[in-house]
Amino acid sequence: MGKNVVVLGSQWGDEGKGKIVDLLTEKASAVARFQGGHNAGHTLVVDGKTTVLHLIPSGILREGVTCFIGNGVVLAPDALLKEMKGLEENGVPVRERLRISPNCPLIMPYHVALDQAREAKRGSGKIGTTGRGIGPAYEDKVARRAIKLADLFRDDLEEKLRNLIEYHNFQLTQYYKVEAIDFDETLKLCKEWKEEIRGMVTDVTEDLNQLRLAGKNLMFEGAQGTLLDIDHGTYPFVTSSSVTAGGVSTGTGIGPLYLDYVLGITKAYTTRVGSGPFPTELFDDVGAHLAKVGHEFGATTGRARRCGWFDAEALRRAVVLNSMSGICLTKLDVLDGLEELLIGVGYNLPETECAGAHDAEFYEAVTPKYETLQGWSESTVGITNYDELPENAKIYIKRIEALIGCPVDIISTGPDREETIVLRDPYDA
């Protein structure tokens, strides 16, 4: 029988999921995205060549791997076609390898306009969205008025679209005081999208299930990170989808008992893009060092990432939320040369009448408890054998394992897929 492996972020995103998915797809027959949209940014480095993917699963570069976009993803057809074009220009046969659920809600021009108008109106209180229409698209889905990919092929598309544009234009022009979205232009776009995407639409749930029954290895690729989950993250500074392992089943239709292994991708320190609380954030030279050496700039937005010490307490919670089987520790090499390393081992909690919130107010109010470990001067860049790691690096890894109650199964020591230590392969676990 094959194995079904989930790969997801365990912090605030940007943990290095793309590289690990690309690495592990050597043993997978299919890779499926199950949530989010083109707000994700997965960077792959293969033989020194960098590819950034926002919507298409990271397995697309592997010959013989089928990539699926599940119903939990909000689909921006214009972004998809642009990404496809870039890959095809580099010789990747995307149309042969990519399949898309007809149940994906579409990100329309009015969603992008709403997203950007809302952020502008919030001023200093902005959430820090990517401005790509993700939130408003999920909003329409939950309100049961979304235009889904399937609607492009149905006779009532024009009526649905006209009603929706009228509804959203009222908000845009009357409340946000910005330009209205043109109906005719949007309808024309929909007709173009239909023809471009037609050959890739499929019943993703059934296709994945048939692969499972045939004993094939499957992979489910998460976007963003656990602490950005709509339910379990630092609300309201979160994304609009279910980022945790539970989102796999709702976002693809593959039931939870069919999932064999959950891998949490985790940086050896902590980063966050945009607004929101960050208990272990650094504002000193060490924070600047992590940002510089770690090249901490968002693949989607280009925004500088905030950097801080490893937060073991936040990760311990992520392990529980996702029932993680193991973690992959990335960017260990960024810590090379630091004399001391601090780990956030817990929080000093404020008095409250409402325990267990774990939202933005909770994380703003806590102060971290730190434990200090000795760093290492040796380079870990490109090491592929655990025994070759500096002794203090091993101590750091073992301490993390003890604090979070989960084994470190993979260690990344550089951006290339080959610069990796695999202690336990998820497909062999």
UniProtKB/Swiss-Prot annotation:
Catalysis performed (reactions): IMP + L-aspartate + GTP = N(6)-(1,2-dicarboxyethyl)-AMP + GDP + phosphate + 2 H(+)
This protein's UniProt keywords: Cytoplasm, GTP-binding, Ligase, Magnesium, Metal-binding, Nucleotide-binding, Purine biosynthesis
Cellular component, GO annotation: cytoplasm
Binding site for IMP: 14-17, 39-42, 130, 144, 224, 239, 303
Binding-site residues for GTP, renumbered to this chain: 13-19, 41-43, 305, 331-333, 412-414
Binding site for Mg(2+): 14, 41
Main EC class the enzyme belongs to: ligase
Co-factor note (free text): Binds 1 Mg(2+) ion per subunit.
CDD domains in UniProt: AdSS
Pathway: Purine metabolism; AMP biosynthesis via de novo pathway; AMP from IMP: step 1/2
Reported cofactor(s): Mg(2+)
Cellular localization per UniProt: Cytoplasm
GO-annotated biological processes: 'de novo' AMP biosynthetic process; IMP metabolic process
Record-listed E.C. numbers: 6.3.4.4
GO molecular function terms listed in the Swiss-Prot or TrEMBL record: adenylosuccinate synthase activity; GTP binding; magnesium ion binding
Keyword NADP: no
Subunit structure: Homodimer.
Family recorded in the similarity comment: Belongs to the adenylosuccinate synthetase family.
Name of the protein described by the UniProt record: Adenylosuccinate synthetase
The organism of origin for this protein: Psychrobacter cryohalolentis (strain ATCC BAA-1226 / DSM 17306 / VKM B-2378 / K5)
